[in-house]
Amino acid sequence: MEITAQMVKELRESTGAGMMDCKKALSEADGDMQKAVDILREKGLGQAAKKADRLASEGLVSVEVCEHCKRATISEINSETDFVARNPQFQALTKDTTAHIQAKGITSVEELNESTLNGVKFEEYFKTQIATIGENLVVRRFETISADEKGVVNGYVHSNGRVGVLIGAACQSEEVAQKAAEFIRNLCMHAAAMKPTVISYKDLEKDFVEKEFIALKAELEKENEELKRLGKPLHHIPRFASRSQITPEILAGVENEIKEELKAEGKPEKIWDKIIPGKIERFYADNTILDQRLTLLGQFYVMDDKKTIEQVLAEKSKELGGKIEIVKYVRFELGEGLEKKVDDFAAEVAAQIG
């Protein structure tokens, strides 16, 4: 198996062993990362390699926003335990690191390690912090978003430091951008709580929507079986799950269906124009459940659950005198995608007593 530079880099970062030692171990293990860790340990290169068993999946998410809301940075720095995450020194480390990343315009962990903080190479500074705090610490990821003179960015990190969000908006004017900063922060708070994965239904892949629609219908049908058994009202089974599935032709057909219903009900044609928009809105609400779950603009606003973020955004644009469009969205949740290590206490004691 070909041993790539990326594989060597990952093994080196997880074990702290030398680059050539990592390359040799990977070659001997035929590319198997865990076997390579074991080989390093067996060869006496494993003091640092033992760090790989000390999974850093706790820690903090940190957010730094510049004074004029033109630049914002989010980072996740992991520790092994929640106890250390509450340590003031670790909290200061995350804050200082995030501010440093933003100030220097750093875009990668490699660039971060080579940078200088307080007159010391960051890699050395960070190792000193690990030694002082006494746990394996990892700068897992970070991202910075920026705005021009007509844009605005803002951020929010939940008080427990486990969730952080950045949102960037393009505005019609610099004046609108300045006025919109607090509103954008409120949207960040919404996203922290409601967990949208993308900005708009337009960002959802077609295959993903179709797959999720099948799962959604199965979920609702299963729930309906229980509701029917209990004699309760059943869920409506939607015809669609996302606005991405509702073409202009489909919408025209729905409007014709509504007109036929109104005609059958004997409603005068002169009032149809007042009724149809509300029914169309209801149709969208019933048939965009996936958007409501996964897209920022499609979700109902936590501060006004009668309106979607898209509707609130339109109202705020009108209020501030210029269009506001969400163009950037980043959400970090602590440890997402990491497997947390579950310690076997009995096995640990047995190992220590031989």
Curated annotation (Swiss-Prot):
<dbReference type="InterPro" id="IPR014039">
    <property type="entry name" value="Transl_elong_EFTs/EF1B_dimer"/>
</dbReference>
<dbReference type="Pfam" id="PF00889">
    <property type="entry name" value="EF_TS"/>
</dbReference>
<dbReference type="InterPro" id="IPR018101">
    <property type="entry name" value="Transl_elong_Ts_CS"/>
</dbReference>
<feature type="region of interest" description="Involved in Mg(2+) ion dislocation from EF-Tu">
    <location>
        <begin position="81"/>
        <end position="84"/>
    </location>
</feature>
<keyword id="KW-0648">Protein biosynthesis</keyword>
<comment type="function">
    <text>Associates with the EF-Tu.GDP complex and induces the exchange of GDP to GTP. It remains bound to the aminoacyl-tRNA.EF-Tu.GTP complex up to the GTP hydrolysis stage on the ribosome.</text>
</comment>
<dbReference type="InterPro" id="IPR001816">
    <property type="entry name" value="Transl_elong_EFTs/EF1B"/>
</dbReference>
<dbReference type="InterPro" id="IPR009060">
    <property type="entry name" value="UBA-like_sf"/>
</dbReference>
<protein>
    <recommendedName>
        <fullName>Elongation factor Ts</fullName>
    </recommendedName>
</protein>
<keyword id="KW-0251">Elongation factor</keyword>
<dbReference type="GO" id="GO:0005737">
    <property type="term" value="C:cytoplasm"/>
</dbReference>
<dbReference type="GO" id="GO:0003746">
    <property type="term" value="F:translation elongation factor activity"/>
</dbReference>
<comment type="similarity">
    <text>Belongs to the EF-Ts family.</text>
</comment>
<dbReference type="InterPro" id="IPR036402">
    <property type="entry name" value="EF-Ts_dimer_sf"/>
</dbReference>
<keyword id="KW-0963">Cytoplasm</keyword>
